[in-house]
Amino acid sequence: MKHKRTRLRMDRVLLLAGSVLLLLFLAVMAVCAVFFSDTGPRPTAAGQGSDTTRNQAGKTQRVSVTATGDILLEEPLLNTFGSGSWQDCLADIDPLLAADDLTIANMEVPIGGEELGITGIDYSFNAPARTAQNLKDHSIEFVSLANNHAADRGTQGILNTRRNLDEAEIGHTGTFGSQEERNQTNVVTVNGMDIAIVSWTYDTNQPYDQEWQVNSFYSPDSAQSQVLLEDVRRARSQADAVIVCMHWGTEFTYGLNDAQRILGPQIAQAGADVIIGNHPHTIQPAEWIETDGRKTLCLWSLGNFLSSAYQVDRADETFQDMYEVGALAAFDLVPGASGVRVENTRIIPIVNHFEGEYESFRLMKLKDYTEELAAAHSQRRFSDLFTKDWLVQQVHEVFDPSGIELELD
């Protein structure tokens, strides 16, 4: 009996030791899953998804998103940076972009590379191939490509842009390499959430070879506008959240045009959670559009993100000044029992600062700008309006009616 009891005690010791080792193994595996999993944006097979009502029960992680205005690489910026990096031009903004889960920008110019000729004047643009890597260096993970400059270098420019972005691992949509690709939904997965991103423009400055190469809606009553809405409905059925990037509106005005007034509510009705507008080269209002008990965040225009021009000849004094001011929109996509909600929304006004004949480029938050810097800005030589106080006043007048938090203090 004594021998049997000893053996049983040994069995218990071995069982206990085995249990401890198993628990340690499971703990190590859990830690590895947290620290070595890729929670950044991952493209998924286009067109994948479930039915219209997606189950959010198992999804608890929110996704923080930052949207920017137009990246417009005009001649002074190209002369400063050449085919190299953007240096420390975005140093004041970088921490904000690095801290989010997903940054979406409007890439206003083709990234066709040196072989197609680098230009930033006469409203015909083309950027160096290195630009795609610059986007990645500054934590921009996704770009909208449907805009009026998409075809500035024709079909080859469209193809080169897509190739350069692919090589830099930057997600993109709005221009396409085939009809089949055009008919698919672009979905990125971030923190386990499937986010569909749709991109359309009112038109392009230059013609392109095939209708499927660029998403262009032309007018709010066109057949292509119905294709746009069908894209949004399809995206709604294939993703947890839907973001629609629209290149629309009238340049150099705070007011909305007919295309915005008509299509905005229709896009919301079709299933967009967020609408990101660009093209007017100035900020425009933001609002919540309510349809069928749903609320869609609509940012009519975020203005310029990165640009370099003073005394823009097509604008009056107000919008020559406001050409230098844009906004970042930050928001969280939060899963819930009835679908994704948009929360923690805020608008961060920014200033493109440069001095003299396009020197000392610096992108800054307006809240950190000073009257001394405003006095040194190149635009101040032509406009006494260009003061920090006046810029802040304009931003308040545009965004305050939305009730969205404005980061100015």
Regions found by a protein language model. Name each.
Residues 2, 10-409:
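Acidic, metal/ion-coordinating pockets
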